């Protein structure tokens, strides 16, 4: 028998042909959840994780409620410039996951596929396309994306810009991690600033941009300390909180809320007890809604989710407020998702060593060619260093592409192997 969330999702699906109604229904559901998060937060969550749930929900509601100030962007687009212009970023992964949380993702994915979008495209992008092409997202001010890390970016954001008749900005990031690439991207970000001035009919407030970059710098420094502090600690973590943190480490960088979260997270981790459990690194998207994943990893002292590599993609990046464009460019160029898969492999090894990881789950997201293409290379490299890797197929947002039975069987076998390995060392 369908529960209240499933019924709500069906209401939204039934209203897609009336996009204003569908948007109002989503906003009603999201705002109700926002009130619950504020007045009755989940008690098992640490203070930082409770705060993350609140600010992520707020960041999802704002562009949906005010599309005239919204920008459709990809997850890696530097958003300090948007914050300086008081614009509201909306990105594919967040849109899709919140639709999933409302049990409404399938209707929008089906809408996109019915409009000619390939079924093999990343489900996150199909959900955003369905929201946009149906009119449910409202008409944003513009679209903007980078070439990192997904070839769906060009299709998704260009198609939406053409559909709405709005400007589109594309930031092509060079493959190499060097000073020439940083200089090139810095110039393109200055062009993006001019693009924003044209779109908003406002001049860039350079002091506001410097302040945003300063927030980013302090946030990244605190997050780096938090990642290091995880070593040997028994963390009270859950899979959904790792998704919320993706907001902080990407589109919310440059905001005081992101800095506040990072400060709270460091305090929570430093207050955590030492020792215990099998320690896991998760690579790529986390299917937070899947029961087999939640049941085995949420708040588990035995099987602990320590880190998702998407929340460690820019560790060690220094942000200089006096050189905002160069700082944003360096963060983008040196992102582990830019260029060779070796960058991502090396970051995973750094995290494994630093955080005393026992095993790695490498999630092959439906439609993500980069992640699936690097899977065997990743597995071979980490296992050569003594870190077992589970390659797990699935979908981080579309229930139709998930197989709970297979996920449960493979996770159980992997965790049992890690437990046996630990017992043999005792």
Predicted regions and their residues:
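Redox- and metal-dependent alpha/beta enzyme cores, enriched for Fe-S-associated oxidoreductases
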Residues: 75-76, 81-111, 281-353
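A charged, amphipathic alpha-helical module
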Residues: 2-69, 186, 190, 194-312, ...
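An N-terminal, globular interaction/scaffold subdomain
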Residues: 50-121, 125-137
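Internal, well-ordered alpha/beta segment that forms a basic, Gly-enriched binding/recognition surface
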Residues: 125-225
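Short, flexible loop segments at the rims of nucleotide/cofactor-binding pockets, characterized by
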Residues: 48-50, 117-124, 147, 335-341
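C-terminal hydrophobic structural anchor segments
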Residues: 339-386, 390
């Amino acid at each position: 028998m369908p529960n209240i969330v499933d019924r709500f999702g069906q209401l939204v699906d039934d209203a897609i042909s009336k996009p204003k109604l569908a948007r109002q229904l989503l906003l009603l559901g999201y705002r109700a959840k926002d009130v619950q998060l504020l007045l009755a937060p989940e008690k098992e969550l640490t203070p930082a994780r409770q705060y993350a749930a609140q600010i992520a929900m707020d960041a999802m509601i704002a562009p949906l409620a005010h599309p005239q100030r919204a920008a459709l962007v990809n997850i890696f687009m530097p958003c300090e410039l948007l914050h300086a212009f008081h614009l509201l970023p909306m990105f594919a992964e967040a849109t899709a996951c919140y639709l999933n949380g409302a049990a409404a993702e399938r209707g929008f994915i089906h809408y996109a596929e019915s409009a000619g979008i390939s079924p093999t495209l990343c489900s996150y992008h199909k959900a955003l396309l369905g929201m946009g092409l149906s009119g449910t997202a409202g008409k944003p001010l513009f679209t903007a994306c980078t070439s990192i890390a997904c070839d769906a970016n060009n299709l998704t954001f260009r198609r939406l810009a053409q559909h709405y008749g709005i400007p589109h900005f594309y930031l092509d990031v060079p493959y190499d991690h060097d000073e020439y690439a940083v200089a090139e991207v810095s110039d393109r970000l200055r062009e993006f600033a001019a693009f924003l001035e044209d779109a908003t009919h406002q001049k860039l407030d350079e002091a506001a941009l410097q302040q945003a970059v300063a927030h980013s710098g302090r946030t990244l420094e605190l997050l780096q300390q938090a990642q290091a502090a995880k070593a040997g600690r028994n963390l009270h973590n859950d899979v959904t909180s790792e998704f919320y943190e993706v907001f902080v480490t990407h589109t919310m960088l440059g905001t005081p809320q992101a800095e506040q979260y990072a400060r709270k997270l460091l305090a929570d981790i430093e207050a955590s007890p030492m020792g215990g459990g099998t320690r896991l690194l998760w690579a790529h998207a986390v299917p937070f809604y899947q029961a087999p994943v939640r049941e085995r990893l949420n708040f588990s002292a035995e099987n602990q989710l320590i880190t998702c590599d998407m929340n460690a993609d820019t560790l060690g990046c220094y942000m200089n407020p006096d050189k905002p464009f160069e700082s944003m460019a360096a963060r983008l160029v040196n992102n582990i998702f830019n260029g060779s898969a070796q960058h991502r492999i090396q970051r995973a090894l750094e995290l494994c060593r630093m955080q005393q990881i026992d095993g790695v789950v490498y999630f092959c997201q439906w439609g993500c060619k980069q992640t699936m293409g690097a899977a065997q290379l990743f597995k071979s490299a980490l296992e050569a260093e003594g870190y077992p890797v589970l390659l797990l197929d699935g979908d981080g947002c579309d229930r139709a592409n998930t197989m709970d039975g297979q996920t449960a069987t493979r996770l159980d076998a992997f965790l049992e192997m890690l437990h046996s390995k630990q017992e043999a060392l005792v």
